[in-house]
Amino acid sequence: MSSYFVNPLYSKYKAAAAAAAAAAAAAAGEAINPTYYDCHFAPEVSGRHAAALQLYGNSAAGFPHAHPHPHPHPSPPPGCGGGGGPGPGQDYFHAGAGSPTAAYQAAPPPPHPPPPPPPPPCGGIACHGEPAKFYGYDNLQRQPIFTTQQEAELVQYPDCKSSSGNIGEDPDHLNQSSSPSQMFPWMRPQAAPGRRRGRQTYSRFQTLELEKEFLFNPYLTRKRRIEVSHTLALTERQVKIWFQNRRMKWKKENNKDKFPASRPEAKDGDPKKEVSGLEEDGAEGCPTN
């Protein structure tokens, strides 16, 4: 501590300072003179400084105060106001002086302040026991809805999945499907009620073979249906349905109940046909008069 700061504060203790300086010199047995540096202060100033330090030490002993550092610095030995470094070993500043014990007896150091209390385990906030007991509810194990903050942002804003930095890298970022939580019932594809199959398409070869079979016989037997289905790589049901549709189409086009293959054919021994044939031949061969 500099003497320029101490002397104005303790200027009224001049008599006490002189007495304290004399007592300190008598106790030390010899004058305290530094060997390797000089404080360049007058004797009166040095005496005042020593007295001020002694009074400061006594006042500190009477009124202890908390020091910001855990280890307080002891006061320097009296007789030098030049500002030597504080520390327990002050004798290395005064190698030619007498015993440093006498100097410390003249100016006793302030007592060690009590250690500061340990910080609370809750980071400076007083804890009131367990949270379940303090808040009055059981400590439930809650699982986070989203693992990261990015996923939460994607769910809140599904259309902005890509950040502004990589929009150019992914031009189709707006066409990406939204999250399942944003799927509404009207967005889902509506399935057709019932068990309805699609329209069966036939190749040209299959259609040609079925037409030939229809002209030969519009009604297929079970045996012939199996053969046609194996030949055309179709099922029996598909062949059956095709023949049903073809018969309905023919009836609609011709307005007749009979099919070409089921027309009545004249038998070989039919007398009516023979008689009619003879009449026609006679009419042609016998000219009328």
Swiss-Prot record:
Pfam families: Homeodomain (PF00046)
One of the GO biological process terms: negative regulation of transcription by RNA polymerase II
One cellular-component annotation, GO: nucleus
Listed SMART domains: HOX (SM00389)
Listed InterPro entries: Antp_homeobox_TF, HD, HD_metazoa, Homeobox_Antennapedia_CS, Homeobox_CS, Homeodomain-like_sf
Biased composition (Basic and acidic residues): 252-276
Localization in the cell: Nucleus
Residue ranges: DNA binding: 195-254
Signal sequence bounds: none
Keyword vocabulary terms for this entry: Developmental protein, DNA-binding, Homeobox, Nucleus, Transcription, Transcription regulation
One Gene Ontology term of the molecular function aspect: DNA-binding transcription activator activity, RNA polymerase II-specific
Motif Antp-type hexapeptide boundaries: 183-188
Region (Disordered): 62-125, 162-184, 252-289
Domain of life: Eukaryota
Bias (Pro residues): 107-122
Protein family per UniProt: Belongs to the Antp homeobox family.
Function: Sequence-specific transcription factor which is part of a developmental regulatory system that provides cells with specific positional identities on the anterior-posterior axis.
Protein name: Homeobox protein Hox-D8
Biological source species: Mus musculus (Mouse)
